[in-house]
Amino acid sequence: MIQTKLKGTGVALITPFKEDESVDYDALMRLVDYLLQNNADFLCVLGTTAETPTLTEEEKKTIKKMVIDRVNGRIPILLGVGGNNTRAIVETLKNDDFTGVDAILSVVPYYNKPSQEGIYQHYKAISEATELPIVLYNVPGRTGVNMTAETTLRIARNFSNVIAIKEASGNITQMDDIIKNKPDNFNVISGDDGITFPLITLGAVGVISVIGNAFPREFSRMTRLALQGDFANALTIHHRFTELFDLLFVDGNPAGVKSMLNAMGMIENKLRLPLVPTRITTFEAIRKVLNELNIKC
């Protein structure tokens, strides 16, 4: 079952751009190869970190196909299919080609600020529109509304193809409530690199990671050790990343991880407006920490 495979370190893929801001498909394929070679457990394609709202429909189709073809079934593909127009998502799920997609990631509707009942009905409509496994995504810092533990559990209990939640509320009490009361066939996945270790100690099964773009091998090692109950060694790795966790998001995501990958010589440091690269002070701080870490990946 797919919920047994969406564990460990999933990587939220960035979209590399060239200097002219066109998609750098060659760099994207090199990144996918790098992640496959360095123990990423699954890939999240066309999520927040991919700057998906700034991509054209044609670019999204091309990225999806190229990544699926390159992965070729070696690890699961989680595809971002979300928005704040329920009807449009339902139409997408009914009409698009999802060959090679193992599950979809669907964010809580943003901007409209639905009630908890509205959130429930939104996911009910999505669940009924597809047989694909669904991973919920709660990130109130971006959406403007928090999906409560009660609503999450109600959805998890009522819709069998809803298999997990990517939880990025930052509310450990809420996450713990979900973990303690969830059905057996429903998992909690961290949506925040910095709390992955403590969340696994509570019963989460892994992370959809941003920093994993740069350090898949070492971050995967941390999650695997934690999942095996080797908390001492996992915590040692977690502490090595603490400063980078902060730098990743000080100027927004994916600006931080793109600066990181640029400093490593893997991509151009380009984003599409309204996002911009990190400040030079942040970039230099990232480069300094990278030099100090000297992590072999």
PLM regions and their residue ranges:
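Active-site beta->alpha loop and helix N-cap motifs at the rims of alpha/beta catalytic domains
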Residues: 2-144, 154
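Glycine-rich phosphate-binding "P-loop"
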Residues: 138-139, 161-162, 272-273
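Short secondary-structure transition/capping segments
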Residues: 55-58, 91, 116-119, 147-149, ...
